[in-house]
Amino acid sequence: GVSVPGGKVAETSEEVEAIAREFGGVVVVKAQIHAGGRGKGGGVKVCKGPEEAKAAADAILGMQLVTHQTGPEGQKVKKVWVEKGSNIKQEFYAGLTLDREKVRDTFMVSTEGGMEIEKVAEETREKIVKAAIDPAFGLQPFEATRLAFALGLEGKAVRKAASFFMGLYKAYTESDASLAEINPLVLTDEGDIIAVDAKINFDSNAMYKHK
């Protein structure tokens, strides 16, 4: 139930150029490191064609990308993700993590998509809506629908967002993740709800179950 744009991984700028030519139109070249905030560090480039995509890959591949989540040493970019461009109407944030104080998984959504959620929490905390999930029942459809309404969605977009949230929760629990962030979560001009970017952390104590 988690919709994503089409895309492919590449390790060279020549591969990026070929993928961009295959996709046609606008593509997004994204550095593949395990950290958020890549856009601010120059690790995400929107490109109008194959030549721009190749140039972007030349700039990103091999760079030491520093973000607010990598620390000052940064991380070296060895691969990029080439993604089909989306017709974005509105951006949101959606995330799941364990609230250690309440000892419950908590679903969070915000209308402030594309921004660092830590900054939103610090400056405009009221723009983050949270739902503590009862572990005995898991995320319920009515809770997912309530979260969709909290984003100001209407009509079919509410149903699609609720379905997306149910799918994200299922992926989060079945993979024993400790964090799942979709930022941005996008409403397209066509009325679809898709994950344009994501970050997932897994519980290292549960890795043996997935070998």
Name each model-derived stretch.
Residues 189-211:
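Acidic, glycine-rich loop-and-beta core segments that form the ion-binding/anion-interacting portion
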Residues 116-157, 161:
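Cap/lid and interdomain-hinge subdomains that line or gate substrate/regulatory clefts
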